[in-house]
Amino acid sequence: MAKLTVRDLDAKGKEVLMRVDFNVPLKDGEITNDARIVAALPTIKFLLDQGARLVLTSHLGRPKNEPDPAFSLKPVAARLSELLGKDVKFVSAAIGPEAEAARAAMKDGDVVLLENVRFYPGEKKNDPEFAKSLLGNATLFVNDAFGTAHRAHASTEGVTHFAEKSAMGFLIERELEYLEGKLENPEKPFVVIMGGAKVSDKIEVLSKLMEKADTFLIGGAMANTFLAAEGYDLGASKIEGDKLDLAREILAAAKAKGVKFLLPADVRVAMKFEDGAETFCTAPFAEGGKVPEGGMAIDIGDKAIEEFSAIIKDAKTVLWNGPMGVFEMDCFAKGTKEVAEALADSTAISIVGGGDSVTAAKKFKVQDKLSFCSTGGGASLELLEGKVLPGVGALTDKCCCGK
């Protein structure tokens, strides 16, 4: 069922509670990356231009259900004020007399940022009384925090039970457009690049995407588990020993469906796991290649890079979720870097499914050449698994006039 978007709301002169994702990195009280604040600006500006009285709520970090100055949103209010070119009033509480007074004093076009919602135990518990207090006198609710849309918390799901109408912002709308819409009937060939550490973390998304994908390209430590399941010698590489049967089941399922499931033809090996370590590529596994005793496969090899890049070049749609190796260290970054560059050079619709893959795309400066980079981690994965996100499912249906 289609949900209301911010375009469907008449916000003029009305108090609107908006859940944003301002979970930005801080160092000594200074914001080191404001990308999440910038991502929320289109929806914020849209509502302010309409003349809404906008109340923003967010979490930051993982405080222990109580106030902690290290996780205060005060620096965010200052940065948001700079970006908007207007005063953003910061309130050092999310509910209670101070928050109520600040909200009561608002005029049309004003914006207030409440203190970290996770300073209150009622947030994660999705406590109805806390949700009701957080909504306050707002009649409209807008959720634009995709990164927490998979959490049924008071500020994402609970408040919708008390608002007249609840809608998604532009950021969530765009996430759904790509992670659901573009992948509903993807242009073929549809290639899925899957990496990361654990097969067990990706089993549901692998199963779901197998219904639509033509080819899987597998990298990261999870590739080691599949290679071990095929009987190859991986030395001291990281392997999920208790998931070998699961890996074999996935390989068999792909074969039965006629889906190509490509494992790395070779891997990049180091004898020490440290930055600056010397590395070398194994011979192709099909030609008797193996990881020597004590060696660790920490990236895909040169032949694998060549094969993966050729398949990406011919694709029409590519979904990338998970790095090919430990790209944070330059000596183990080649596989992820070259796959990212192949994706950037392709004419395919390129969708990066959040988390480490987006970090890698930024590191290798290809983000602007890709069709879409998700802002979610767990939320992206759950959406790709076909799950309904609580923060989206709770929004008002398009066919309804209210809730």
From Swiss-Prot:
This is Phosphoglycerate kinase. It comes from the Bacteria. Pathway: Carbohydrate degradation; glycolysis; pyruvate from D-glyceraldehyde 3-phosphate: step 2/5. GO terms for biological process: gluconeogenesis; glycolytic process. The keyword Ubl conjugation does not apply. It is found in: Cytoplasm. One of its GO terms (cellular component) is cytosol. GO terms for molecular function: ADP binding; ATP binding; phosphoglycerate kinase activity. It is an enzyme of class 2 (transferase).
